[in-house]
From Swiss-Prot:
GO molecular function: glycine hydroxymethyltransferase activity; pyridoxal phosphate binding
Modified residues (N6-(pyridoxal phosphate)lysine): 229
GO biological process, one term: tetrahydrofolate metabolic process
Residues where (6S)-5,6,7,8-tetrahydrofolate binds: 121, 125-127, 355-357
Annotated site, Plays an important role in substrate specificity, chain positions: 228
Underlying gene: glyA
Family: Belongs to the SHMT family.
Keywords: Amino-acid biosynthesis, Cytoplasm, One-carbon metabolism, Pyridoxal phosphate, Transferase
Protein name: Serine hydroxymethyltransferase
Any one GO CC term of the record: cytosol
Length: 417
């Protein structure tokens, strides 16, 4: 029998110390990794519930195990809520991650060796969109499109590649692109060659839910997303569709289970349900609007300080700082900013001469700091501090001064109070 009197810090002090240190880091450092955010305490409460104990292979009402009547309620709540959030008529909330959701779509709709057309990782796409190091680039014949000299998707070039290679699937979505995507144009390109249009909206799902970024739901055959990032839920994935026929729905359902997954993570699905309820609240739209305002304030400030932003600015939650030609690499900049308690990630930029392990870019995002309560002026200040560090990454005095300023700012906006 378990004892409620035993605490983690006494039973496993090594692990407890690591968890406490990470909690402290999240409070004391500014989080600018575009794919990270903070879950609400309610989301974490659901994820830490007894639902973690339950096996529930199958779907609500059609399980392979007994005792699923209550986890069925949790999963159905998640399904119904996410359909309402995005205006979908099909939703699968079981994928363990965005990458698994993408894998499910490929395996449901394609055969090994089929041609896919996706955005190059080096130009802002994602590993799972056909990168050679990923299964999507090994199982399928992956053709890649990129951005032009202005850092924008060249839709005429995408059309040319589609016409030339006749892909069975066109993939739209990104991990490092700061402008709005013309989903209708992508659908027209896909239709012109008889291809599926698959949209991975993982990075902008929260913005889409709030109506501050165009929705792909009326254009794509199938849509996937993560449930963290801008959606601000637990780490996980979802698959959505609108107007999908019965055959497509059956393929998607059966490929998730039993195709590539067994038992779903019911505690995570419960946490997803909480996050989806939060996404339906009026405050969520206000939050997403502020995410974009904050990103634009940061981008404009960095531009004013002489730093190049790929595509010239941002219309979403992120920006890509291009440092080609500068002495500092993305790797060195990430390390220097880390010493100043500013957490970012190095990132390749279009036509990057440095390796992906070094890079000439930084990806910055505002979802996490906006959750803390940051406003535009806070982001102007923060962007100036970032520029100060990038101007003098080896100057310990500058790093110390910025670290002190960041510490004071973090105390002003605690994550969990």
């Amino acid at each position: 029998m378990f004892s409620r009197d035993v605490r983690l810090e006494t039973y496993d002090p090594e692990l407890a110390k690591a968890i406490a240190a990470e909690a402290g880091r999240q409070e004391d450092h500014v989080e600018l990794i575009a794919s990270e955010n903070y879950c609400s305490p309610l989301v974490m409460e659901a994820q830490g519930s007894q639902l973690t104990n339950k096996y529930a292979e199958g779907y609500p009402g059609k399980r392979y195990y007994g005792g699923c009547e209550f986890v069925d309620i949790a999963e159905q709540l998640a399904i119904d809520r996410i359909k309402q959030v995005f205006g979908a008529d099909y939703a699968n909330v079981q994928p363990h991650s965005g990458s698994q959701a993408n894998q499910a779509v490929y395996l449901a709709l394609l055969q090994p060796g089929d041609t896919i057309l996706g955005m190059s990782l080096a130009h802002g796409g994602h590993l799972t969109h056909g990168a050679k190091v990923n299964a999507s680039g090994k199982l399928f014949n992956a053709v890649q499109y990129g951005v032009n000299e202005q850092g924008l998707i060249d839709y005429d070039e995408v059309q040319r590649l589609a016409t030339e290679h006749k892909p069975k699937m066109v993939i739209a979505g990104f991990s490092a692109y700061s402008q709005k995507i013309d989903w209708a144009r992508f659908r027209a390109i896909a239709d012109s060659v008889g291809a599926y249009l698959f949209v991975d909206m993982a990075h902008v799902a929260g913005l889409v839910a709030a109506g501050v970024y165009p929705s792909p739901m009326d254009h794509a055959h199938v849509v996937t997303s993560t449930t963290h990032k801008t959606l601000r839920g637990p780490r996980g994935g979802i698959i959505l569709a609108k107007g999908a026929g019965e055959d497509l729905v059956k393929k998607l359902q059966s490929i998730v289970f039993p195709g590539i997954q067994g038992g779903p993570l019911m505690h995570v699905i419960a946490a997803k349900a909480v996050a989806f309820k939060e996404a339906l609240e009026p405050e969520f739209k206000t939050y997403q609007q502020q995410v974009v305002k904050n990103a634009q304030a940061m981008a404009n400030t960095l531009i004013a300080r002489g730093y190049k932003i790929v595509s010239g600015g941002t219309e979403n939650h992120l920006m890509l700082v291009d440092m080609i030609g500068r002495d500092v690499s993305g790797k060195d900049a990430e390390a220097a900013l880390g010493k100043a308690h500013i957490t970012v990630n190095k990132n390749s930029v279009p036509n990057d001469p440095r390796s992906p392990f070094v890079t000439s870019g930084l990806r910055l995002g505002t979802p996490a700091i906006t959750t803390r309560g940051y406003q535009e002026q806070d982001c102007v200040d923060l962007a100036n501090w970032i520029a100060d560090v990038l101007d003098a990454p080896a100057d310990d005095a500058v790093l110390a001064k910025v670290r002190d300023a960041v510490t004071a700012q973090c105390k002003k906006y605690p994550v969990y109070g």
